[in-house]
Structure formats: C-alpha cells, structure tokens
Amino acid sequence: MRVVNRTAVTITGAQPFVDWMRDTDADFNRGAITVPRAKAYGSAFLLPEFDLEEDLQEWVEDNVAWLFDFQLSAWTENEETWPENRDLATFREWFRIDIHSVVVDVADDDIEGEEL
C-alpha cells in the first residue's frame, strides 16, 4: 500500500447528463438510470498534485472540451446525439466534480494502462 503523488478527480453525471443518457438509449428510459445510479458510469482522473484548488479548477477549464467528450463517448460514440453546446457552464450543469487530495494505491501489482 502506498500514497500516490497525484490528485484524483472524479466526474459523475448530474440530472441533465442522466436525462441525456435516457434519451439516447431506450432501454434506460424505463427509470433504470437515476442520478445516484449514474455514479457507476463516472470516471476518475489522476492529475498532478496541485498546491491550490484554483490550479486544479484551471486545469479543468483548460481541458473541459476533452473531459466533456470523454464522458459522452463513454456512453455512446454517436456524436450526433451529443449536445451541441459543450462549454464549461454546460459541463458544470451536466457533471459533478469531486476532488480527492489523498490517493492511496492498495494493490500489490503495478499500474497498467493504455495511451489515449
């Protein structure tokens, strides 16, 4: 077990995102997805450690287009269903951002990943 020198940011869907999920998939239009259940469809990002929360907020602002597209593509890659307006204000309406300053890796094996 080790503390990792990263800041974790989790992004989960708020009501507008859940409504969009339902609209794009009829199987979920029956109430299977709610805001609390949408948490399972969230994402976690490991960022460099930031001394100030303002620096982290600036990172989100600088990367909002990529973050928004990433969240949408995790649900469907059909960009025709994506909202046209994907700016910072809309992102903040559609998603909840949680910051975790302490990240602990409890696994014994090395972290593996693929480049995006």
Name these PLM-found stretches.
Residues 1-50:
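Extended, charge-biased low-complexity segments
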Residues 46-113:
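Amphipathic protein-protein interaction modules
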